[in-house]
A protein has these predicted regions:
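Hard-cation-handling environments
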Residues: 229-375, 386-387, 437-439, 444-447, ...
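Short, surface-exposed amphipathic charged segments that create phosphate/polyanion-binding patches used
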Residues: 150-154, 287-295, 415-416, 465-477
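His/Asp/Glu-rich metal-coordinating catalytic cores
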Residues: 1-55, 64, 71-252, 256-273
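Short secondary-structure boundary/capping segments
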Residues: 94-99, 103-107, 221-223, 256-261, ...
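C-terminal, active-site-flanking charged/polar segments
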Residues: 359, 434-479
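Charged, amphipathic alpha-helical linkers/stalks
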Residues: 459-518
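Generic long, charged, amphipathic alpha-helical segments
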Residues: 387-418
């Protein structure tokens, strides 16, 4: 009975965990790496076709996005997820496949002119459709049995519609162990969805640490803040453009705007129009409504019971076709435009930036995280111009942001989730956080809760029956390609040496408190190694 850590170790994206128990082999999540990639990930230790099943925490691409690639490599087994997660994956994986194929077509068209070899997409639409047929819909809070000796329960993680923490009971050799995967833990009091469920018992815990080193601070009154921005922008004759993630954040914005309109918070602009220009966002909004009775919180359900749709209001218009999208920019009235992608690196939002960035009457409002290197981050950091569709556009619009809005719990929320266990777990594995954040949060779990906590690197293996590490992997940093393959190889070898140095320091710290004679012998061994390799010829 063991767990092997594959992805989202000392990194935020690419979640994947491999488990062996009760004679079965299975995964928890199989996500896509997004943004900068700093560490090498261990390959799956078995062929995809040898896996028995997959458990999926939620639909975000960094947890589900590589499932079609798993199917393409031979996996034909079931994927267990909540009803809403299955519904969201149906649109998100198909959308991802479309992007993969479009990018491959574009790169190959360009590459043929330059004589480059054909670029193969990570997966195709056929792969996405194939894997979607294998999804198994599971209710919250009900134990299912994917295999003899393995029991599973999904509980609400409060992060996204359908998101879950997963409780797994494993029985082997008449011994039973419980491991809990936190998934992404949500904020309290988010619009629409319920708060995270706290779990009382676990032998082992694998938990995220996205914001394990920081607090979101006091939560602003978002409808009031948004109303003030709309008012100010409309009063000067401008448009409000909101780059927004299609799934989750767009629905939050609609929820806030419905409140603003209902309460009459924008004066002198009655009946203003709100465009949602993202086919994926429009499909996701429909899925939110279809899963209301299992996923909505009490406040949203009260609205529904009164016959009020929390995500709809007078003046809301959705665009599907590209002609619909283009027509928005010919509407001369003041308006709100919500479009993807949230970081402005793709999608229809780029067209709206082209038409609105240059005008000082307009406002570009960011409502989500902007990664380093993205156009959204550049705008927030004061870019004075932006290249869009081969044209340089001057930035004259007001650039603004709504602070603290996040689907992830901050460090206090994470500690409260971990504190809910009534007895201390045997071990807590901290993952899904930036390199230093995982270590910082693991240390806080030790100091504040007295937990045995570590932040494993990819490839680390842990025996769940014996409660011991079988193999402690070291982080192998990815070396950027250089002009010389020889230089790249040398850099990779040197990085491995540094990784072993980090491992040595870890072992030294673990030996604190050991008998003096053992420490003396350890020190002599290290001294001998240093004497052997201390180079005087360089």
């Amino acid at each position: 009975m063991k767990i092997t850590f594959i992805g989202a170790t000392h990194e935020v994206t690419g979640s994947c965990y491999y488990l062996e128990a009760a004679g079965r082999k299975f995964l928890v999540d199989y996500g896509m790496e997004q943004g900068p990639d700093y560490y090498e990930n261990k390959e799956l230790p078995v062929a995809p076709g040898d896996l028995d099943f997959v458990l999926l925490t939620h639909a975000h691409m960094d947890h589900s996005g590589n499932l079609p690639a798993l199917y393409a490599k031979g996996y034909q087994g079931p994927i267990y997820a909540t009803e809403a997660t299955c519904n969201l994956c149906d649109i998100m994986l198909r959308d991802s496949a479309h992007i993969q194929m479009f990018e491959a077509e574009w790169r190959n068209r360009k590459g043929r002119r330059e004589g480059k070899p054909e670029f193969i997409p990570a997966y195709t639409m056929e792969d996405a459709m194939g894997v979607l047929r294998n999804f198994v819909r599971c209710p919250y809070d009900k134990i299912i049995k994917p295999a003899e000796g393995i029991e599973v329960r999904f509980v609400d993680a409060g992060h996204l519609l359908g998101s879950s923490s997963i409780e797994i009971w494993l029985t082997e050799d008449d011994k039973k162990e419980k491991i809990v995967f936190s998934g992404d833990i949500g904020n309290l009091n988010q619009p629409l969805i319920k708060d995270p469920v706290y779990i009382k018992e676990a032998d082992y815990v694998v938990m995220e640490s996205t914001y394990g080193d920081r607090s979101h601070g006091e939560r602003p009154d978002y409808p009031v803040m948004l109303a003030e921005i709309i008012q100010k922008t409309f009063d000067r004759g401008g448009n409000l453009v909101i780059p927004s993630f299609a799934v989750g954040r767009t629905q939050e914005m609609l929820y806030f705007i419905r409140q603003i309109k209902e309460q009459g918070r924008v004066h002198g602009h009655d009946g203003f129009t709100v465009y949602v220009d993202s086919p994926l966002a429009n499909e996701a909004t429909t899925i939110f409504s279809e899963n209301a009775y299992t996923c909505y919180d009490e406040e949203a359900m009260d609205l529904l019971n009164k016959g009020i749709n929390p995500l709809s209001f007078p003046g809301l218009k959705t665009s599907v076709t590209t002609d619909d999208s283009r027509a928005i920019n010919f509407d001369e009235d003041c308006k709100v435009i919500i479009s993807a992608s949230g970081m402005c690196d793709a999608g229809r939002i780029k067209h709206h930036l082209k038409h609105n960035l240059w005008d000082p009457r307009n406002t570009i409002l960011f409502v989500g995280y902007q990664a380093i290197g993205t156009p959204g981050r550049a705008l927030l950091e004061g870019a004075t111009e932006m290249k869009l569709f081969g044209e340089t556009v001057q930035v004259a619009a007001e650039i603004s942001r709504m602070p603290g809005i996040s689907g992830h719990a901050d460090v206090n929320g994470l500690l409260n989730w971990a504190r809910a266990f009534e007895t201390k777990p045997k071990h807590v594995f901290v993952t899904h956080g930036d390199d230093t954040v995982t270590e910082v949060f693991a240390q806080r779990l030790k100091e504040e809760l007295g937990y045995d906590a570590t932040a494993p690197f990819s490839g680390t293996e842990y025996d769940l029956l014996e409660n011991k590490c079988i193999h402690e992997a070291v982080g192998i940093r990815i070396v950027k390609a250089t002009a010389s393959p020889k230089t790249t190889k040398a850099a990779r070898a040197y990085e491995k040496l540094l990784a072993m140095g980090r491992r040595l320091m870890t072992i030294i710290r673990k030996n604190e408190g050991c008998p003096n004679k053992d420490l003396d012998r350890f020190a002599r061994d290290i001294q001998s190694l240093c004497d052997k390799w201390d180079r005087t010829d360089i």
